[in-house]
Amino acid sequence: MYSLFPSLTTGFSVGSSPEAEKLPRAVEFSKALYTLDIGQNDLTMGFRTMSLDKLRSAIPGIVDQVAEAVKNLYNEGGRSFWIHNTGPHGCMPVNVLYNTSAPSPGYLDKYGCVKFKNDMAVFFNTVLKERVVKLRSELPLAAITYVDVFSAKYWLVANAKILGLANPMTVCCGYHVGNDHVWCGFKGKAKNKDIVGPSCVDPSKFVSWDGVHYTEFSNRWVAQHTLNGNFTDPPSSIAQACHRH
């Protein structure tokens, strides 16, 4: 779909319509920063439908598709790329909300995250970073930044208490007590009463919004600390992301 965009905008810009002025000029496509964020849903579905061995063996192929997308953008004139790795899957509260009994030893890490899921995410990110290094040599005119979203989000989980946040394995929105589970904004029963999954009073005190998605506070924190280069390779701010290092 992207390959059609430059040619279509060029065609529209030939006219004098006011709408044409809102479209990027052809020269701007090579100056743009292209952001790729892939892997989260691939692993989520993999955990649901595949054995761990099969999922692990599928990861190089998934990463190859990311690399192919970068190459296609490069061939279309793209030169600057901001590539996110995948986050700590095991640290999403949805993983533990239904656990009513104590987990087996080694199932959780010291912050309450499901260890095997984070291990798989780390493997995915290792393969992705190796591929990014290879892309840098294959695409000599490209500026490619690897963004370590995993480390940023894991740091937030690990330091939630220091930051004055609630237990990172709890959620702001939704009702999850014992065997009663009503998801954020959905209708359901709790203590034999009809309710709608409620929101907490202060979302800025929580890491997770609904067990899967992060709160606005968390997303802002991660954005600030990746945009300034704290969790990027090379370690430079987004303002420098369009420059080769």
What does each model-identified segment do?
Residues M1-L4, A58, I62-A69, F124, ...:
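Stable alpha-helical elements in mature extracytoplasmic
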Residues S3-P60, N75, R79-Y98, H225:
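Oxyanion-hole/transition-state-stabilizing segment in secreted/luminal serine hydrolases
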Residues F29-K31, E76-G78, L141, N179, ...:
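Eukaryote-biased feature marking scaffold/signaling PDZ-domain proteins and nuclear chromatin regulators
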Residues G39-L43, A69, E76, P88-H89, ...:
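Conserved beta-strand elements of beta-rich interaction domains across eukaryotes
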Residues L55-P60, L108-A121:
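A short acidic, glycine-rich active-site loop
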Residues E68-S80, M120-I144:
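A structural motif corresponding to the C-terminal end of an alpha-helix
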Residues P88-K115, K134-S137, L141-V212, P235-H245:
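Mobile gating loops/cap/lid regions near enzyme active sites that modulate substrate access
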Residues F217-H245:
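C-terminal helix/juxtamembrane-tail motif
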